[in-house]
Amino acid sequence: MARVTVEDCIDKVENRFELVLLASHRARLIASGTPITVERDNDKNPVVALREIADETLTPEDLKEDFIQSLQKHVEVDEPEAEAVPALSSAPDAAQSDAMGDVQFDRMTEEDLLRGLEGLVPPAATDDDGE
């Protein structure tokens, strides 16, 4: 790449990292068949992309927007909701309280838990541990 081309581009895109991203994106577009806006002059696609940016035949803002759109997987569309979500009441209604009254949980004391754990048998030792 010609140093003159890169130095001409720095006037248009101040950040070198952003310049690399934009020029590489444009070079990929050229490789995929997008028509070029400057004479090729036997240059490769990255050099042509830098020359397009330097000659201002493409604006960096348009390239940046196109680059962002190429990376997006889902495009969000802001649409108003059809109807508002109903607000939750702070007090449960009668149907909910009846349903919750039918639910019972098993309660276990600490002694019952310890007795249950003592009744467990450890797994048998295997010969895989020591060869």
Swiss-Prot record:
It catalyses: RNA(n) + a ribonucleoside 5'-triphosphate = RNA(n+1) + diphosphate. One of its GO terms (biological process) is DNA-templated transcription. Keywords: DNA-directed RNA polymerase, Nucleotidyltransferase, Transcription, Transferase. Residues 78-131 are annotated as: Disordered. Residues 104-115 have a biased composition (Basic and acidic residues). SUPFAM superfamilies: RPB6/omega subunit-like. GO terms for molecular function: DNA binding; DNA-directed RNA polymerase activity. Its EC number is 2.7.7.6. Gene3D superfamilies: 3.90.940.10. SMART domains: RNA_pol_Rpb6. One of its GO terms (cellular component) is DNA-directed RNA polymerase complex. NCBIfam families: rpoZ. HAMAP family: RNApol_bact_RpoZ (MF_00366). The RNAP catalytic core consists of 2 alpha, 1 beta, 1 beta' and 1 omega subunit. When a sigma factor is associated with the core the holoenzyme is formed, which can initiate transcription. Promotes RNA polymerase assembly. Latches the N- and C-terminal regions of the beta' subunit thereby facilitating its interaction with the beta and alpha subunits. This is DNA-directed RNA polymerase subunit omega. It comes from Beijerinckia indica subsp. indica (strain ATCC 9039 / DSM 1715 / NCIMB 8712). The lineage of its organism: Bacteria, Pseudomonadati, Pseudomonadota, Alphaproteobacteria, Hyphomicrobiales. The gene is rpoZ.
